[in-house]
Design a protein with these regions (language model features):
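Class II aminoacyl-tRNA synthetase catalytic cores and aaRS-like
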Residues: 1-578
């Protein structure tokens, strides 16, 4: 036996008792004649007092110990209110070394978050001893447990889908696994359980979910872990888009209410719904951060009637701000704009008499100035910024200027989680290089208008039943009403340049299953890692994953990816080329 109680179970009730505790040496303090050890386990820290110097012989920080001693009250002047056991201490009578430290520690455990990430990841098992780092993983476990119970309570059945599956074109690069038995054949790790969950609906299951591992060979971002991530994947039969919305917003709202920091404000249900077109206009992106009160306006038509040549023939966006701005602020904002690739950033300041001051004032006819004020809702003290370019670039630039203004002027709502749905995404898009029409997102989404729309409309005008959930500018989930009709599916793929044979080859299981009476179905998949990153207010998603890869998709701790033996390569019929 190594311990009687954990640190969280110890209290003043044990005073006068002989106890055995176990943990790691967090700190050693020598006060001349008496020494102290801060002993840490997963649950907390306990002060151990050493009055026999021989007990400390050979003891160093981060050794794993079992200590037997008498529980005592601390002297009142030495109380530590920062820890639950701050009024008690253990007087050591016996110390057993359970795990020695043979090498110099690469960093101080308590300050591990302050060192270089590559060192932290190489010694992640030490980094995780830091209570602040460990707390994220404990928190993650609690959130996942809650999500699992919530879905079960809502009538969903948890079903595991295969990890080794067939490769299919789903947007990102696959991780492929060679077959030993079938020369030249490969499995793929699933980018998502997409086809399997749809096959479950075709199998007659009504509501499915799982905490699903997903694997994508793509580059890292602050909110995207390379290699592997987890999502709360769910699918439902006999439902509309609105039915899925109700489930998604209930799960996310209730999860954030339970786990968000105390005092946080969370969007009430139903979440606002913003079309893709509206999002691109008002926010400059399809991931709107609703904590930022600034909105983007379209003033294209107005400026076609003015004489400012750089705006004529271009899409013109405007952002109105009511805030004090110095000349230096304008210069910094212009510098930011040029760093994005913009040629400049026009603006007007509104004076008390509602006259304008700014470089483009003289290009607006006098009789039109009141029209601009009414259109943009201008008042004295406002500044309005203008962005002009091709439509896609104007949206992109305006979105970044909006974000920069919100951050630099401290306009972003604090302690808030602001959710929305973004829907009505385009079904198809034009590849700017090949000029070929392809799917915008998931190829098996149901087009709005069904087969008639595919037969009669310009493909680039067709919308899909696709939707995202966005929170604070972070895409938390994507989903769609699925295309379960073979005829609609064949036509949609034909528009995107795929013949029926390709459909059968690449998505054979779905193609075959949908020949036998597939039900209407829809679903979504909120990202677990991103959810926890937001709830913990972490800037990097790797902080909420126990053993994350680095930004280059390397496991610095275990050395993956690594080399394998020639024998292993031969067994799977692979030869590595230089």
């Amino acid at each position: 036996m190594y311990r009687d109680l954990t640190m969280k179970e110890i209290s003043e009730q044990q005073i006068g008792q002989t106890l055995q505790v176990a943990g790691w040496v967090e700190n050693i303090r020598d006060h001349g004649g008496v020494s102290f050890i801060d002993l840490r386990d997963m649950y907390g820290v306990l002060q151990v007092v050493i009055r026999k110097p021989e007990l400390l012989k050979g003891i160093t920080k981060e050794m794993c110990l079992s200590i037997t001693g008498l529980m005592e009250h601390r002297d009142e002047e030495t109380y530590n209110p920062k820890i639950p056991s701050g009024t008690i201490e253990l007087e050591a009578h016996k110390i057993d070394v359970l795990g020695r430290v043979y090498k110099q520690l690469p960093f101080e455990i308590q300050t591990s978050k302050e060192i270089r990430e590559d060192v932290r990841l190489k010694y992640r098992y030490l980094d995780l001893r830091n209570a602040k780092v460990k707390d994220n993983i404990v928190f993650r476990s609690k959130v996942i447990s809650y999500l699992r119970q919530k879905m079960t309570d809502m009538g969903f059945l948890e079903i595991q889908t295969p990890i080794l599956c067939a490769s299919s074109p789903e947007g990102a690069r696959d991780y492929i696994v060679p077959s030993r038995k079938f020369k030249g054949k490969f499995y793929a790790l699933p980018q998502a359980p997409q086809q399997y969950k749809q096959l479950l609906m075709a199998s007659g299951f009504d509501k499915y979910f799982q905490i699903a591992p997903c694997f994508r060979d793509e580059d890292a971002r602050a909110d995207r872990s390379p290699g592997e991530f987890y999502q709360l994947d769910f699918e439902m039969s006999f439902v509309t888009q609105e039915d899925v919305f109700k489930v998604g917003e209930e799960v996310l709202h209730d999860t954030f209410v339970k786990f968000a920091p105390e005092g946080s404000r969370i969007t009430e249900t139903p979440f606002p719904i913003i079309s893709y077109k509206q999002a691109m206009l008002e926010f400059g992106c399809d991931k709107p951060d609703l904590r930022n009160p600034l909105r983007i306006m379209d003033v294209t038509e107005f400026f076609q009637r003015c004489t400012f040549k750089p705006f004529i023939g271009r899409t013109v966006r405007a952002i109105k701000v009511h805030a004090e701005m110095s000349k230096g602020f304008h210069e910094k904002l212009l510098s930011f704009a040029t760093s994005l690739g913009m040629g400049g950033l026009g603006y007007l300041e509104v004076a008390e008499d509602m006259s304008y001051k700014g470089p483009i004032d003289k290009f607006i006819p006098e009789e039109m100035k009141g029209e601009l004020a009414e259109m943009a809702g201008l008042s004295a003290g406002d500044t309005i910024f203008f962005i002009a370019d091709k439509e896609d670039k104007a949206n992109y630039y305006a979105g970044h200027i909006r974000t920069e203004l919100g951050e630099k002027l401290d306009l972003i709502e604090k302690d808030a989680y602001r959710f929305c749905y973004v829907n009505d995404f385009p079904m198809f898009e034009l590849d700017p290089e090949t000029k070929q029409i392809g799917f915008t997102h998931y190829p098996f989404s149901m087009p709005q208008g069904g087969l008639e729309a595919l037969n009669t409309m310009d493909p680039l005008e067709i919308l899909a039943y696709q939707y995202d959930i966005v929170c604070n500018g972070v895409e938390l989930s994507s989903g769609a009403v699925r295309n379960h009709d073979i005829e609609i599916m064949k036509k949609a793929f034909a528009i995107a340049g795929y013949d029926e044979e390709t459909l059968k080859t690449k998505f054979g299981a779905l193609y075959q299953a949908f020949q036998f009476g597939a039900p209407p179905h829809a679903g979504m998949a909120p990202g677990v890692d991103r959810m926890i990153m937001l709830l913990r207010n972490e800037d990097n998603i790797r902080e909420v994953i126990a053993f994350p890869m680095n930004g280059n998709a390397q496991d610095l701790m275990c050395g993956a990816p690594g080399e394998v033996t020639e024998q292993q390569l031969r067994e799977v019929h692979i030869k590595v080329r230089d």
